Each structure stands twice: as C-alpha cells, then as structure tokens.
C-alpha cells in the first residue's frame, strides 16, 4: 500500500532520531529531484542501455512516450526487488522489527510530458536541446549540471535520465504538491502536503507519496492528504476562467519558444500551476450547532482555496484536477458530476419522442407512396394489355366482314345452269 498512518507521536514521546515530539513538519528543500538517489533516474543512457537494452532495443530511436514507459517498467522491477529483500530480512530476524517504508522505492509520481515532444524521438529531442543551448562551455548559470570538461561537448550517453528529462521539460506532477505542503511558522494544525513519517500502515488512494493520514500526539488532530486528482467542485467561475486564461497563455508561450530556436536561451522547465489539495485547517470552538460563518481571511493565499474557519475545512474553489488535465496528455482526468443535465432529461425525452414519431411518419408515407406507385404501374400495364387485345379483335372482325362480303359477291356472279325440270301434266287416267 502506498500511504501511511503515523502513530509514533501518540504517546508524546520523542522520535528515535532525537528530534523530539514536534508537531511541525520540516519543509522540504527548494530543489525537488525527480527520484531518490537509488532510482533509475540517476543512471546515464549508456548504463541504461547496458542494463535494460536488449537486441533491437535502442533508447535513442524511441519516442518520449516509449521512454517513459520503459522507465516506469524498470521502476516497478526495482521496487519489487527492493521490497522483497526487507521482507526476507524481517522473516529471518523477527526481533529486528519492521523496516521503515521510507527505504523502499515507491512508484514515482506521474510525469507531465509536453504535447510538442511526446511523439519525438530521444535523438530529436537531444538535437533540439543542443541547438537551443548552444555550446555547453559558453552557457552561463549551468554550473553543477554536468561534469564534462569545458573543451568537450557532452554526449547523450553521458547524460543522466534526470538531467535529460529536466532539460527536456518533463516534470513530475507531485513536485508542485510537495512544495504546497511545506508548513511555515508555528501553525501546527494545518495541511501537510507530504508526510515524512517513517513507519505505519498504508492506505492507497492513487499516488502513494501524497496520500497519508497522520495522528500527532500533542495537537490531537488528524491530517488528511488527498490525491491531487480529487477535489470539491464549487462555484468559483471567475477564478476558474482566470486560471484557464493563464494556463492558455503559458502554453502558447512555451509553444512559441519551442518553435522559434534561440541559440543562447535554455529550454524552460514546463511547470504548470496546480491547485492545492483539500486541506483541514485549525478547529474552532463553536458554541451552537449552527454554521459559524466564514473566517476573516477568506483567501489564505492557497491558490484559490477558500477557508471557512467555523467548520475547519479549506475548500478549493475549483477542482484541483481540472487545472492540469488540459495541459498534458498523461495526467488523469477527474470525474466531475455534470448536474446540469438532470433538469433537461424531460425536455430531451420529449424531443427524442418527436423525432421518433417524425421518422415513423416519414417511413409510413414512403411505404404508402411506394404502394400507390406500384398499383398505378400495374393498372397502366393492364390497360396496355387490354388495348392490344382490343386492337387484335378489331382486326379479326374486319377480316371476317371482308370475307363475308367477298363470298356474297362470288355467289351473285355465278352463272345459271340448265332449265328447271317441271312436272308434266298427264292426260291419261281412269276418268
């Protein structure tokens, strides 16, 4: 499991390291490395090719998406190897206790990859970096990044993954959240962006490094860290529009800087502003059970977080996940309930029913027209047939009449034969 609950300070005792029972979390350093020192990011490309490269697998010809997938696969394999070794040690030595989870290599936070270089190969990105940075020995302000002598240019195989990803503009998403989690002053009841407790139980809610629940012994309060992809959606439309405009302007500036090469200008780090998580502020004593109202400091400089002191909850005006979901291709998109569609369901059903009725009427009218046309064609064919039969009968009748006329003419023209024989009168008789 990725997140942890710290029960070390419940009894009020000091930390084993001698730091005492302090409720204040020490702020992290200003430089946020991409990984721990023992991670894959500290390897150079040559070491990575010798370690993970196989026959037909060249990291220079991969695009940036495939490179990140290979790095994540190597991280998972290294994490499994490092978690199996402490487990075997704990089984062999039960009295030694459970090793702290801080020594294990957890899954790194998701990397934000700019869309302009997501489909480019590693060699193309390296050439772009060389053309934009110019000569390595002539660049100013780059001390400590490379151990290459000034007379020779650094090659891709000698560069570490961390330096390459930093110069290419690939940034971990949880760096911004860790910087937001730093605590200033004596505010012991605030929100901690990342818990540095060494032991405890784990509950995973997304990113392992950011989701932790810590119980402190002196302030009797619970500190809840939620993943950066979750948040409460409220009606801060003006702030959301302003933030979207700022993000669009930053993205356009980065696109222009990538498309227009500058020989003496270094590639800027692609860091998009992210909203802080939902935080629980200091509890306030309330005499009655009603709502106490908003505190004096409605906006506590938390990048759009509206604080309500009566309930002890700091609520984001907009969803933290929506600020970075539009600017990168690999960040998770939060699930936002679309409540506006519920009121239009009746109207949509009526419109859909009308459309179905119109379609049925059109189909029935087309069928009736087809039947009528077929009946008309059939009648026309019958009429043509009857006309032909009538013409044939009329021809036969005319021929018969002509034959009768001819016979009458022939009989009238026939000559008379011998004289008719008549009975003679006889004079002989008995009287």
Swiss-Prot record:
One of its GO terms (cellular component) is nucleus. Residues 372-411 form a coiled coil. GO terms for molecular function: DNA binding; DNA-binding transcription factor activity. Pfam families: bZIP_1. One of its GO terms (biological process) is abscisic acid-activated signaling pathway. Residues 351-414 form the bZIP domain. It comes from the Eukaryota. Expressed in roots, leaves, flowers and immatures siliques. InterPro entries: bZIP, BZIP46-like, bZIP_sf. Its main location: nucleus. Disulfide bonds: none annotated. Signal peptide: none annotated. Residues 353-372 are annotated as: Basic motif. The modification Phosphothreonine is found at residue 155. Residues 379-393 are annotated as: Leucine-zipper. Keywords: Abscisic acid signaling pathway, Activator, Coiled coil, DNA-binding, Nucleus, Phosphoprotein, Transcription, Transcription regulation. Residues 1-29, 133-153, 319-338 are annotated as: Disordered. Induction: Up-regulated by drought, salt, abscisic acid (ABA) and cold. The modification Phosphoserine is found at residues 39, 61, 110. Disruption phenotype: Defective in ABA and stress responses. DNA-binding heterodimer. Interacts with CPK32 and the AFP proteins AFP1, AFP2 and AFP3. Interacts with FREE1 (via C-terminus). PANTHER family: ABSCISIC ACID-INSENSITIVE 5-LIKE PROTEIN 7, CAMP-RESPONSE ELEMENT BINDING PROTEIN-RELATED. Functions as a transcriptional activator in the ABA-inducible expression of LTI65/RD29B (AC Q04980). Binds specifically to the ABA-responsive element (ABRE) of the LTI65/RD29B (AC Q04980) gene promoter. Binds to the promoter of FREE1 and activates its transcription. This is ABSCISIC ACID-INSENSITIVE 5-like protein 7. It comes from Arabidopsis thaliana (Mouse-ear cress). The lineage of its organism: Eukaryota, Viridiplantae, Streptophyta, Embryophyta, Tracheophyta. The gene is ABF4.
